[in-house]
Regions:
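Iron-sulfur-associated redox domains of electron-transfer enzymes in respiratory
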Residues: 1-214
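Short, well-structured alpha-helical interface segments that form or flank functional binding sites
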Residues: 88, 222, 226-232, 236-239
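Histidine- and/or cysteine-centered catalytic micro-motif in compact active-site loops
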Residues: 166, 236, 242-249, 274
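Oxyanion-binding "anion nests"
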Residues: 206-214, 231-242
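Ferredoxin-type iron-sulfur electron-transfer modules in oxidoreductases and energy-metabolism complexes
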Residues: 208-229, 247-341
């Protein structure tokens, strides 16, 4: 992988040139809430924001979209109408989240809708500063070595830029005059110090070692019922999680016609209706069962299948849950067999 150097003052010019490839999107903050928005340039972005409300998976796996239109003659797929986008400012944890989504939607059974959006999206990562909700140090997702086209590490006076794909190389070639391959001893020392400094910024103390065994041992623990007493089953944790991928499919038909659309939309195993089957039986009618399923999948089952948790430590569940149920509090409760008050 090639690593280049770029002066910070040259970033606006680079992004202006990159817009030849597609729409430019970046993190913007309004009324203390940060979201990805279409922007004209760097001046509209908030690169100091720790996290966006909704992860960037929404660009690859939209909250709702039409798969195809149908009538009595047949159906026509909705393809080719996805715009080309450049997402700038993605943090390491969110890129790790997209890598997990890639594994689920592009391997074994390739999802054509996800694949089209992934192909038409460039991922330009940016370094970040952890806050008291960040847990990526515990999930080993505080740095990233793949999954991006370019990654910009802010070393105060300049950027170190990792080129992660051929498309990233294409962007660099558009303004090759802004980049340098001449890295020296000081650049190495600065980057080493940056890594030490970032690691020291983590305030959330969370230890996820041994979680698969702890979940197995605690499968019938009363802790789940205690947590369920607090849980609202609102599903916010699923909506903001970078790796949640459950969906439902519904046909929308115009009254009095046989014309309609087949739509896919986000769903959540935290919803009571999620596990209802024909005849009205519900496999997970109890809130405790749904809560246990969600966390068992994140911190046990996914590790068993893929060797790493399906939590990337972004802290969105911490900042979103109104009753303080999140990866940190649940793992702590299981280890101590006591729900924090």
């Amino acid at each position: 992988m090639m690593i280049l150097k770029m002066k910070k003052e040259d970033l606006p010019a680079f992004l202006e040139s990159a817009k030849q490839w597609g729409e430019l999107w970046g993190p913007t903050t309004k009324e203390e809430q940060t979201a990805y928005s279409k922007v004209d340039g760097l001046s509209q972005m908030d690169l100091k924001a720790t996290r966006t409300m909704i992860p960037p998976k929404k660009f690859l796996y939209p909250p709702r979209f039409t798969m195809f239109d149908f009538d009595e003659e047949g159906f026509v797929e909705r393809t080719g109408d996805v715009p080309k986008r450049i997402l700038f400012g993605l943090h390491p944890c969110d890129i790790h989240g997209i890598l997990i989504m890639d594994k689920l939607f592009l391997e074994t059974y390739k999802d054509p809708y996800y694949a089209e959006r992934r192909e038409k999206t460039l991922l330009l990562g940016h370094s970040c500063i952890p806050d008291d909700k960040c847990m990526c140090f515990a999930t080993n997702t505080d740095f990233v070595a793949e999954g991006f086209d370019l990654f910009f590490t802010d070393l105060k006076m300049f950027y170190l830029v990792w080129v992660g794909s051929s498309r990233g190389h294409d962007l660099v070639r558009m303004r090759a005059d802004l980049f340098s391959r001449n890295l020296d001893k000081n650049d190495i020392l600065n980057y080493t110090e940056y890594r030490k400094w970032k690691t020291a910024q983590f305030k959330a103390k969370i230890d996820l070692t041994g979680m698969p065994d702890i979940f197995e041992l605690g499968y019938n623990s009363p802790v789940w019922d205690e947590l369920a007493e607090k849980c609202l089953s609102c599903g916010q944790c699923s909506m903001v999680c970078p790796t949640c991928n459950c969906y439902n499919v519904v046909d929308e038909v115009e009254l009095g016609t046989v014309e309609g659309t087949r739509d896919r939309f986000w769903d959540s195993c935290m919803f009571r209706e999620y596990s209802v089957v024909a005849g009205g039986h519900n496999f997970r009618d109890k809130r405790a069962d749904r809560l246990r399923l969600w966390y068992t999948h994140k911190l046990q089952a996914f590790i068993g299948e893929f060797g790493k948790p399906a939590c990337v430590g972004c802290g969105r569940c911490v900042s979103t849950c109104p009753v303080d149920i999140n990866v940190a509090t649940v793992s702590k409760a299981l280890k101590e067999q006591e729900v924090g008050k």
